[in-house]
Amino acid sequence: MSESALNTAIQAIARGLPLEESVLEGAFDTLLSGEAAPEEVGAFLAGLTVRGETANELIAGARIMRRHGRSVSVEGPLLDTCGTGGLPWKSLNTSTASAIVIAAAGGRVAKHGNRSVPPKTGSADVLEALGLQLELSDTAFKSCLEIAGVGFLFARSYHSAMRHVAPIRHKLGIRTIFNLLGPLSNPAGAEYSVLGVYDKQWVTPMAEALKALGTRCAWVVHGLAGIDEISISGPTDVCEVTPASIRHFQITPSDAGLPSHPLSTLEGGAPEENTAAIRDLLDGREGPFRDIVLINAAAGLHVSGMVADLPAGVQRAAQAIDSGAARETLNTLVRTSRESD
């Protein structure tokens, strides 16, 4: 049935027809089982991209991606801070730095991420440069979470089925639905998240997908300056997701009691540059990177129910940095990742 489901899906996409849930799940199952021919993978992914993916397609894809992935069972509430990537410029690793700060402020963070394509630096690239052991057993991940308050889930280790579509994605050279599915597929099942998207058009569909997938509370965000995180350079579109509703609003840096900074002040580079920026941040350096980390960490603390609003979150995040707790959290995370197992 799965092979015919993929063919059915390709034909429906070509004709502009909606796809039934069973067909969608069968199509994704074929892709991630390695049963699809390269031309079928390309036709399906390119067709969805050209037509524009829907929330239902995101939901079906995430369900099958989770089913094919390796999961880790963790008790208690977990937060993920992640973004879709796909930005046209080299950025600093805001969500990674925010995860460390949130953990230092008392949160529990299951940070899901991957490498990026050079010259950009992904969360895995910068954490490895900071000394983290990326390939962790479930026991080692849990130790990091228990001892440091944050653990890293290396996407390549948990979603090995992606190897079946990776060559075609690379050859296509365009964003595909899998750029959106990764942030929806946290291996630890984090029920809280701050999820950044690279384009405003994905804010609502990703929010609808998170709601359907059982999220307890999340913010899907797009910085209107063109970034997949809460912006310190202008307004940010937000969809707040709870089991009962999806609420749309905008926030600005001033809502968190922070100044604005030009986007150009936040440009990153190679892992060494981004690593230095994180170390400087944790050593107390003030400036644009600190402020964008503060507002994104504040959102994570708020989504997790730890603070009432963004200003309170900024204050708590700043205390975590200025007290040295965030620096110690990073050191503990790195040490634990290397000592476990």
Curated annotation (Swiss-Prot):
Question: Top-level EC class, please?
Answer: transferase
List, separated by semicolons, the cofactors it needs: Mg(2+)
Q: Which domain of life is it from?
A: Bacteria
Residue positions binding Mg(2+) 2:
228-229
How is the cofactor bound, in the record's words? Binds 2 magnesium ions per monomer.
Q: Return the InterPro entries for the record.
A: Anthranilate_Pribosyl_Tfrase (IPR005940), Glycosyl_Trfase_fam3 (IPR000312), Glycosyl_Trfase_fam3_N_dom (IPR017459), Glycosyl_Trfase_fam3_N_dom_sf (IPR036320), Nuc_phospho_transferase (IPR035902)
Alphabetically ordered keywords of this record: Amino-acid biosynthesis, Aromatic amino acid biosynthesis, Glycosyltransferase, Magnesium, Metal-binding, Transferase, Tryptophan biosynthesis
State the function annotated in the UniProt record: Catalyzes the transfer of the phosphoribosyl group of 5-phosphorylribose-1-pyrophosphate (PRPP) to anthranilate to yield N-(5'-phosphoribosyl)-anthranilate (PRA).
Q: What's the family?
A: Belongs to the anthranilate phosphoribosyltransferase family.
Give the protein name, as stated in the record.
Anthranilate phosphoribosyltransferase
Source organism per UniProt: Hyphomonas neptunium (strain ATCC 15444)
- Taxonomic path: Bacteria, Pseudomonadati, Pseudomonadota, Alphaproteobacteria, Hyphomonadales
Q: What is this protein's gene name?
A: trpD
